[in-house]
Amino acid sequence: MDARDIIRRPIITEASMAQTERKRYVFEVDTRATKPEIKKAIEEIFDVQVSGLNTANVRGKKKRQGRYVGYTRKLKKATVTLSKDSKDIQIFNEG
């Protein structure tokens, strides 16, 4: 997989923005991606040094439309910790 296919989008919430001060960033990643692939993709795209990586598989929520039941899509979140001497990721610092 290409690095741009692994990293889908940044997850920008109040909780994730509070972690940026400690150089921790949260991304939605491809569900098939492994930790080494995610680390390599982050380092390649943003030109940073990753010191830690945690992942979480989030299952889809049950949603109803009348009597029909379906599920939202499942996703995988990756929390990336950068090294002390690494620069910040600019996506999270913009307005």
From Swiss-Prot:
PROSITE patterns: RIBOSOMAL_L23
InterPro entries the UniProt entry points to: Nucleotide-bd_a/b_plait_sf, Ribosomal_uL23-like, Ribosomal_uL23/eL15/eS24_sf, Ribosomal_uL23_CS
GO BP field: translation
Record's keyword terms, sorted: Ribonucleoprotein, Ribosomal protein, RNA-binding, rRNA-binding
Signal peptide residues on this chain, from the entry's feature table: none
Gene Ontology annotations for the cellular component aspect, listed alphabetically: ribonucleoprotein complex; ribosome
Molecular functions per Gene Ontology: rRNA binding; structural constituent of ribosome
Family designation: Belongs to the universal ribosomal protein uL23 family.
Subunit and interaction comment: Part of the 50S ribosomal subunit. Contacts protein L29, and trigger factor when it is bound to the ribosome.
NCBIfam families xref list: PRK05738.2-4
Function: One of the early assembly proteins it binds 23S rRNA. One of the proteins that surrounds the polypeptide exit tunnel on the outside of the ribosome. Forms the main docking site for trigger factor binding to the ribosome.
Protein's recorded name: Large ribosomal subunit protein uL23
UniProt lineage: Bacteria, Bacillati, Bacillota, Bacilli, Lactobacillales
Gene name of the record: rplW
